[in-house]
Amino acid sequence: MSQQLQQIIDTAWENRAELSPKAAPADVREAVAHAIEQLDKGALRVAEKIDGNWTVHQWLKKAVLLSFRLEDNAPMPAGGYSQFYDKVPSKFANYTAEDFAAGGFRVVPPAIARRGSFIAKNVVLMPSYTNIGAYVDEGTMVDTWATVGSCAQIGKNVHLSGGVGIGGVLEPLQANPVIIEDNCFIGARSEVVEGVIVEENSVISMGVYLGQSTKIYDRETGEVSYGRIPAGSVVVAGNLPSKDGSHSLYCAVIVKKVDAKTRAKVGLNELLRGD
C-alpha cells in the first residue's frame, strides 16, 4: 500500500503546478488524504531511524506540501472567542473524551496541533504549537510557547523548554527535517532549524541557535563541525574569533559530556506525566 501511495504522490508532485482544489484527480486526493491520516496516527512518519541511521521519506514530505495545494481555506471555530481561516484543521477538532483517553496525552489550553501531526502517549502539550507532519514521541514535554515545526521529529522523554523553536521544512523549503533524539533537553528560547540533528541524551543550554551554517566547536578536541550535535553533549552559546582577530562570530560550544550532575538538573518530572 505504501509503495502505491508513494508512486501516486511522486507523480502528483511532478505535476503539482496543474493541481488545485478544483482540479485534482480522485486518486491523488485519496492518496494525499490517506498519507496525512497515517501521519496523524503515527503509522507513517517523515523520518525514522533504520539500522542506526536516519532515513527521510521525501514522498511523505511531498504529501504534506500537496495537501496545501488541494485544499481551500475555510472558517474554523476557535472556542467561541474568534475564528481561524486556514487549509488544515486542528488535530483535536473532532476529538471526544474517549479519543483523548485513548491518546493518553495532555493538551493544555490553548495548545494547538494541526491534523497530520502525531502526539504519543504521556506527551504534555503546554500552550504551544505543533505543525503538520511533526512526530512527538512518548513522554515528551512541549513547554509554553514552544513550536514544533512541520515534519520535525521529536524523540522520547524530550523536554522542549519555554519558547523553543524547532524548525519546519515547508518555508523556507528544507531537504530534511529537524530531529531531536531521545532524552534530550532543549533550553528556553533555543532554536534548532534547517535539518539539524541533536543526538540522544544531549543538553542544549538556554538561548542556543543551531542551523546548518552554525559552527559547533568542541572545547575538548578543538574540532569544528556542522549540522549535528553528538550524543550526550552539553552545548552552550559562544563565539569564535576571526583569523585576524578583528571580530568574533557566534557559535555553539560543546563544553562537556552529560554527567550525573547535569542529568539531575534537567531530569523529567514524572508527576506531570501519565494518566
Curated annotation (Swiss-Prot):
Coiled-coil stretches, from where to where?
none
Record GO terms (molecular function)? 2,3,4,5-tetrahydropyridine-2,6-dicarboxylate N-succinyltransferase activity; nucleotidyltransferase activity
Annotated protein name in UniProt = 2,3,4,5-tetrahydropyridine-2,6-dicarboxylate N-succinyltransferase
Work out whether the entry's keyword set contains Repeat. Answer: yes
Question: Which InterPro entries does UniProt cross-reference here?
Answer: DapD_Trfase_Hexpep_rpt_fam (IPR005664), Hexapep (IPR001451), Hexapep_transf_CS (IPR018357), THP_succinylTrfase_dom1 (IPR023180), THP_succinylTrfase_N_sf (IPR037133), Trimer_LpxA-like_sf (IPR011004)
On the tree of life, the source organism's domain of life is: Bacteria
Encoding gene per record: dapD
Residues recorded as binding substrate, renumbered to this chain, are 106, 143
Query: Its catalytic activity?
Result: (S)-2,3,4,5-tetrahydrodipicolinate + succinyl-CoA + H2O = (S)-2-succinylamino-6-oxoheptanedioate + CoA
The record's subunit annotation is: Homotrimer.
Q: What is its main location?
A: cytoplasm
Intracellular or extracellular location(s)? Cytoplasm
Please name one Pfam family that this protein belongs to: THDPS_N_2
Q: Name one GO cellular component term.
A: cytoplasm
Pathway(s) annotated for this protein in UniProt: Amino-acid biosynthesis; L-lysine biosynthesis via DAP pathway; LL-2,6-diaminopimelate from (S)-tetrahydrodipicolinate (succinylase route): step 1/3
**Keyword vocabulary terms for this entry:** Acyltransferase, Amino-acid biosynthesis, Cytoplasm, Diaminopimelate biosynthesis, Lysine biosynthesis, Repeat, Transferase
Q: What is its EC number?
A: 2.3.1.117
Q: Does the keyword Repeat apply?
A: yes
Q: What family does this chain come from, according to its entry? A: Belongs to the transferase hexapeptide repeat family.
Provide a GO biological process annotation: diaminopimelate biosynthetic process
